[in-house]
Amino acid sequence: MVKEFLKKISEGKHLNFEEAREIVLSIDREEITEAQLGAILLGLRLKGENPEEIAGFVDVLHEKAKKVPNKTPAIDVCGTGGDKSNTFNISTAVAFTLASLGIKVAKHGNRAMSSKAGSIDVIEALGFKCSDNPEEIAKDIDDKGIGIIFAPYFHPVVGKAVKVRRELGIGTIFNMAGPMLNPANLSGQILGVYSEKVMHRMAEASLILKKDNILFYHGKDDGIDEISLSGKTVFAYLKNSKIDYFEFSPEDIGVKRYQREDFNGGDAQENAKILENIFKGRAKEAHIDIVAVNSAFALWVLGKVKEVKEGFDMVKDHIMKGKVYEYIETLRGKTA
């Protein structure tokens, strides 16, 4: 079976949904050699992973994941990474900002792969630990407003492919599947993607899987997996079994355009310091504005605001008053 799939991929043909599922099941059953897996991942990358293949991978990986049983549906804010942009951890800042506004957040993340600091590295640098207990994380979401989901604890099948992926040293279909695998009960998701082409494929894969209320985006002018304030952002919004495509520029909501370099980050400690300053409302305006605009789109996806501009103004005011930092200190147990 695996050899048949390899032959098909080597001829530049796409796998169908069931064939893609079968590859992941073979990884789980350990019926595929490292050489075969490496060849399949590279072959898919060279011909270009199509929506059915992505959907097949996601379907099994999510099926096999340990689930987080939060009672109140939550939102996830994450990105594919792989944009080589060295921005600070914007989606992590957005996650805590949303939680401080009373929005339930299930932050699904990992350590750094290609960047200097992954979301989990920064969350730990902020003083928070990651639990491997699904019930504990669900309780954090329901009671505290945010739960941190460290991906490797919850996706055993992904773990079986880590060695091959590391040796390949390139982005593979797993990089697209990863952000689509949040094991919590979700009400919506905003998901940054490193390429516009891949964004379209991921949106179409989610449609195949009958997912709903996911906003995919890509910073078109600067190539980042965030909603950009230094250029145009393109979107694919999956809602009610339909994908809508649209664009956004900072000027649309009266925000000035910044330089791409204004959002540069560093290692986990440096990025944690940037986030602390944002939470206190004492950061550079560029940092506060990009967190506010990404948060505003999340509020829009959840139906909490009618217009992104309304959300932006509300979030920026909230940040400037130090409300996010007050919430962070409560999570740390430093205030009543």
Curated annotation (Swiss-Prot):
Top-level taxonomic group: Bacteria
Binding site for Mg(2+) 2: 225-226
Pfam family, one: Glycos_trans_3N
GO MF annotation: an example: magnesium ion binding
Positions that bind 5-phospho-alpha-D-ribose 1-diphosphate: 79, 82-83, 87, 89-92, 107-115, 119
Catalytic reaction equation(s): N-(5-phospho-beta-D-ribosyl)anthranilate + diphosphate = 5-phospho-alpha-D-ribose 1-diphosphate + anthranilate
GO BP of this protein: L-tryptophan biosynthetic process
Cofactor: Mg(2+)
Residue positions binding anthranilate 2: 165
Residues at which anthranilate 1 binds: 79, 110
InterPro entries: Anthranilate_Pribosyl_Tfrase, Glycosyl_Trfase_fam3, Glycosyl_Trfase_fam3_N_dom, Glycosyl_Trfase_fam3_N_dom_sf, Nuc_phospho_transferase
Binding-site residues, Mg(2+) 1: 91, 226
Entry's Gene Ontology cellular component terms: cytosol
Cofactor binding remark: Binds 2 magnesium ions per monomer.
UniProt cross-references to Gene3D superfamilies, sorted A to Z: Nucleoside phosphorylase/phosphoribosyltransferase catalytic domain (3.40.1030.10), Transferase, Pyrimidine Nucleoside Phosphorylase, Chain C (1.20.970.10)
Keyword ATP-binding: no
Keywords: Amino-acid biosynthesis, Aromatic amino acid biosynthesis, Glycosyltransferase, Magnesium, Metal-binding, Transferase, Tryptophan biosynthesis
Annotated metabolic or biological route of this protein: Amino-acid biosynthesis; L-tryptophan biosynthesis; L-tryptophan from chorismate: step 2/5
EC number annotated for this UniProt entry: 2.4.2.18
Keyword Membrane annotated: no
Family membership noted in the UniProt record: Belongs to the anthranilate phosphoribosyltransferase family.
Function comment: Catalyzes the transfer of the phosphoribosyl group of 5-phosphorylribose-1-pyrophosphate (PRPP) to anthranilate to yield N-(5'-phosphoribosyl)-anthranilate (PRA).
Protein's UniProt name: Anthranilate phosphoribosyltransferase
Annotated source species: Dictyoglomus turgidum (strain DSM 6724 / Z-1310)
Classification of source organism: Bacteria, Pseudomonadati, Dictyoglomota, Dictyoglomia, Dictyoglomales
